[in-house]
Structures are given as C-alpha cells and as structure tokens.
Amino acid sequence: CEIEPAVVEAARVHLADVNRGVLDDPRTQVVLDDARHYLATTNETFDIITSDPIHPWVRGAAALYTAEYYDLVKARLRPGGVVTQWVPLYQTDAAAVKSQLATLFDAFPFATIWNSDPTNQGYDLVAMARALPMSFDMTRMQTHIEDLPTVRGSLGECDLGSALALLSTYAGDASSLSGWLADAERNVDVSLRLQYFAGLALDRYQDHAIYAAMRAAFSVPDGMFTGADHELDALYAALLR
C-alpha cells in the first residue's frame, strides 16, 4: 500500500536501479490506500505484512503501532505468516521504545528483534513475529541465499550476503526482554500515547544507550538457531561479541 500516488511514480522513475524495477514486475500490485484502512476493509490474507511507516512522533504514524492494529494484522495473516515492524531508536527515548515493543509482544509473544546498525551499537531495529515460535536453519538459509542471485545481491549491498551475517543481527526476543519492558505503557487507539512519548524526545539521540540496556537482557532461546556445528559456533561467537 502507498497513500501518495506521487511516491509510486517517483520510485518507478528515479529508483528503479535500487528497487530493481519492482513496480514493473507483473507480480507487483500497488494499492493506493492507507495501509491500515486497506487491512480493515479487505478479506485478503497475506504471507507477509511489513510495516515501515515514518517515525511515530509524526502525526498518524503511531496508529501503525497500536494493539488494535496488531490485532488487525493477526487477522490478515495466513497460517505461518510473518509480520515485520520498524522500530527506531533515534529521536526517541526508552519509554517510547518500550511502548512499541511491549504492544507488539502482547499480540505476538514469540516476536524477535533484529539490529540494522552494522556497528552493533543500535540505531533502529526490525521486529519480526508470527503466531508460533520461530527457528532459523542456517544451512537451509545459506542454500536459499546462494540459489537466489537477486536476493544475494540485495543482501550483499548491506553486507548481509550470508546466513551468518544475516542472523548475526539478532538482538533479542519477547521473552528475554520481559523484565526490561515491565514498566512499559501500551499504545492503544484511544490515546496513541506513543505519538506523545516519541514527540517529547524527538531532539534526543539516546539510541546507543537504549540499545545497550536491551543488550543487557540479551539471550538466545534454545532451538532458535539450528545448523552444522561450525555454523552455530561462528554465529554464537558473533552474537556474543
């Protein structure tokens, strides 16, 4: 979904080399609508629902982080479907980040978080969740990456061109962060508290401190990662560095 038609045209004309011409792919269907409105009014279900709105202090964006929104997402996911959500750590504070994550984790108790900062100090995160526990087979993932040159190329541009590099961005899960989130206030439609939490901190850059607090609670659940012994040894060395 895209709410502004000019954005679609700009992406087609100016960003085709970056998005690999996805808008001209016959498999691509662009829906010109507010994404939440579309989910609320369609009967269609999806394998993946990804939400990458503008920062939650911008008016309206916090509605894509509410408990009601996540209930709607759950209703539109197919069995085994995955939801991803952007979580900024900059221009915000710990209260806002906690609100975002706790609200998501209430709806998806097996959610995981992944760090997008190559320095591993924290800048923003991607939360990934589904209805059931997740596990990641390193051997199978590496095979898929090698068999899909377009995917491999895209990941390589971000220095994530292997299963080891990709899975090394793992930053925690709902269970390990439960203590840190104990005082979190949930974001709901009636108040949109997240919008005001984030707005009060838009001139702050506490991303490294917030991420350090999250890392203090870091752990890897048993069975989350599988693969050959040498693959797992390399992964755990990267995760615990």
Q: Residue locations for each model-derived region?
A:
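Soluble small-group transferase modules, centered on the S-adenosyl donor enzyme superfamily
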Residues: 26, 34-36, 41, 113-241
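The AdoMet/dcAdoMet-binding core of the Class I SAM-like
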Residues: 1-101, 105-107, 113, 120-122
